[in-house]
From Swiss-Prot:
Superkingdom of source: Eukaryota
Keywords attached to this entry: Amidation, Disulfide bond, Ion channel impairing toxin, Neurotoxin, Secreted, Toxin, Voltage-gated sodium channel impairing toxin
Protein name: Mu-conotoxin CIIIA
Purpose of the protein: Mu-conotoxins block voltage-gated sodium channels (Nav). This synthetic toxin inhibits tetrodotoxin-resistant and -sensitive voltage-gated sodium channels. This block is very slowly reversible. Causes seizures and paralysis, when injected intracranially into mice.
Site (Important for activity): residue numbering on this chain: R13
GO CC terms of this entry: extracellular region
Family (UniProt): Belongs to the conotoxin M superfamily.
Tissue specificity comment: Expressed by the venom duct.
Compartment(s): Secreted
Annotated organism of origin: Conus catus (Cat cone)
Broad class of where this protein is predominantly found: secreted
UniProt GO MF annotations: sodium channel regulator activity; toxin activity
Modified residues (Cysteine amide): C22
Disulfides per UniProt: C3-C15, C4-C21, C10-C22
Amino acid sequence: GRCCEGPNGCSSRWCKDHARCC
C-alpha cells in the first residue's frame, strides 16, 4: 500500500513530513 492511505490521506501530519510517499 501507499504511505498516505487512510482517512486523513496526504493531509495528515505524517504524510506532510513524508510527501514523497503520496
